[in-house]
């Protein structure tokens, strides 16, 4: 009995020492976030162990967990929910039931998940999109783009763009009773990346008749050109999303070759001919001073890979690499960033770049925010932070869309 208790105690100590992350002082519900973070890190650790033992790949294990949270398209007395396709792209569609004398607003939402995981069918995203449709009396479309590593870039971008272009067709807008002047593209995390890239493409394509009124980017990931930003250093072992996990997922977006994450961890992954792009992600210029702190800027090292991946220099994959002329036509933009988030500086730099070219930007920064908070809005993983961000997002849409 004593030996069993000792072994159990040692296992508990090992678990705590390996998965414990100190919580910042200003974090609300810190004990709950600590538990969620430990669960996330345990899943990541287990997935990596399984991959190393050749039981299953990392992304297969995590995807299996994500799928446990998928929901059916359940309609209610206010909203009709259906799973359908837009030009072969799976979408979940939310249509208000109450009669409207005028055409409705619409939101096209891209879910997060590091390009590798997730779905609009996830409980949290279904809840968010249903809430948005009901609160705004709006048509909402959740896009289920193809996932890596089964499908590498540009599959995700192409799916997102195809779904949006289909929705913007006059006959489709008429079918769903949507006002073509009141359409928003939104997304969180990697979904924020896709929302950004698709909006850039739509607004700069002269052949697309109807344009987007606004875009909403919630803690978006917009670049990996520089993998050693101040927010990367501060949140290297961060809450929910660590630097190693972020690099793992972004690498799988482009390739299965292990040379890429190895180079990314050392900030040596950009091809030799890409130095001209560094000005678009130079945090020593683009970040507000309070976030630069005493960090010293050094350029990424060129040529660490023995081959070049075109996606690493493509603004469709990394929207912060878009030049100023591509940004000038963008619509009203709402960007939300979180202090305790590895991706914080991506959003902050995009705010600066958009404002520099005259785009109207509303920026809200959550001082006690963490990455992925919108994933924690439903039982049993309920956080007040997630509901707060939901309410900020929907309230802003209601006033501006």
Swiss-Prot record:
GO terms for molecular function: carboxylic ester hydrolase activity. The keyword Methyltransferase does not apply. GO terms for cellular component: extracellular region; membrane. It holds the Pfam family Abhydrolase_3. The active site is at 189, 341, 371. Its EC number is 3.1.1.-. Keywords: Disulfide bond, Hydrolase, Secreted, Signal. It is found in: Secreted. This is Arylacetamide deacetylase-like 2.
């Amino acid at each position: 009995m004593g030996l069993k208790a000792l072994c159990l105690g040692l296992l508990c100590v090992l678990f705590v020492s390996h998965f414990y992350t100190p919580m910042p002082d200003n974090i609300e519900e810190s004990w709950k976030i600590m538990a969620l973070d430990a669960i996330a890190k345990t899943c990541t650790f287990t997935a990596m162990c399984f991959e190393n033992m050749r039981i299953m790949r990392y992304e297969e294990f995590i995807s299996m967990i994500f799928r446990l949270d998928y929901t059916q398209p359940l309609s209610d007395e206010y909203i009709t929910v259906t799973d359908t396709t837009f030009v072969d792209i799976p979408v979940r569609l939310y249509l208000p039931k109450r009669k409207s004398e005028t055409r409705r607003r619409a939101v096209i939402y891209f879910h997060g998940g590091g390009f590798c995981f997730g779905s609009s069918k996830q409980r949290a995203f279904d809840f968010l999109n249903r809430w948005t449709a009901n609160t705004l009396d709006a048509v909402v479309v959740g896009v289920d783009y193809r996932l890596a590593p089964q499908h590498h870039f540009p599959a995700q971008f192409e799916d997102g763009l195809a779904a949006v272009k289909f929705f913007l067709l006059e006959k489709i807008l008429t079918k769903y009773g949507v006002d073509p002047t009141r359409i928003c593209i939104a997304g969180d995390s990697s979904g924020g990346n896709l929302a950004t890239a698709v909006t850039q493409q739509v607004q700069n394509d002269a052949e697309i008749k109807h344009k987007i009124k606004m875009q909403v980017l919630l803690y978006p990931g917009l670049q990996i050109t520089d993998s050693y930003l101040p927010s990367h250093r501060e949140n290297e072992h961060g809450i929910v999303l660590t630097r190693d996990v972020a690099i793992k997922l972004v690498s799988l977006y482009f390739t299965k070759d292990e040379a890429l994450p190895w180079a990314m961890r050392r900030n040596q992954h950009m091809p030799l001919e890409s130095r001209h792009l560094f000005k678009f992600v130079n945090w020593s210029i683009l970040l507000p001073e309070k976030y630069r702190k005493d960090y010293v800027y050094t350029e990424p090292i060129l040529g660490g890979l023995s081959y070049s991946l075109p996606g690493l220099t493509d603004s469709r994959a990394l929207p912060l690499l878009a030049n100023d002329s591509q940004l000038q036509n963008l619509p009203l933009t709402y960007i939300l960033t979180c202090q305790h988030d590895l991706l914080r500086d991506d959003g902050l730099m995009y705010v600066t770049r958009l404002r520099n070219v005259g785009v109207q930007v509303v920026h809200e920064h959550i001082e006690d925010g963490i990455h992925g908070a919108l994933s924690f809005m439903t039982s049993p993983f309920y956080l007040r932070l997630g509901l707060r961000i939901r309410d900020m997002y929907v309230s802003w849409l209601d006033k501006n869309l």
